[in-house]
Amino acid sequence: MGKSNTLGAWGEEKAARYLTGQGYTIVERNFHSRYGEIDLIAENQDFLVFVEVKLRASISHGLPEETVTLRKQEKLRLTAEVYLQNHDTKKQPRFDVVAFYAKDGMETYPLPVRHIKNAF
């Protein structure tokens, strides 16, 4: 597994733990369709949340959440539609971004998490 894949998996696990601590239940990880992948699918009492996890080593190239481009948003929407067609739910769908920074060796330090609800 490459360095970015390892860091990405670590980031998704950190985001899942954060969401669980906020009262969400993780119902799916790395859901794939022909349009793309959704990192996490979580739910709370009211919402079924499609979560894009973003992390960066520094802010020199912008904030992590700024990398969720319009093209990426469209891929996430299409992938969420595939999920919803195959999973019956009465909950309102929502798209969130969980963003934070992580450098090599920082994986053991508590990092501030930004949870952007209804991001797009």
List PLM regions with ranges.
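Conserved catalytic cores of phosphodiester-cleaving nucleases, focusing on short active-site segments
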Residues: 40-59, 76
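Hydrophobic "anchor" residues on beta-strands that sit immediately upstream
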Residues: 25, 48, 92
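Mg2+/Mn2+-dependent nuclease catalytic core
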Residues: 57-85
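Short acidic/glycine-enriched loop/turn segments that link adjacent beta-strands
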Residues: 34-36
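Residue-level signal for inorganic ion chemistry
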Residues: 19, 76, 95
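Domain-level recognition of nuclease-like catalytic cores that cleave nucleotide substrates
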Residues: 86-120
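Acidic-basic catalytic patches of nuclease active cores, encompassing PD-(D/E)XK
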Residues: 1-29
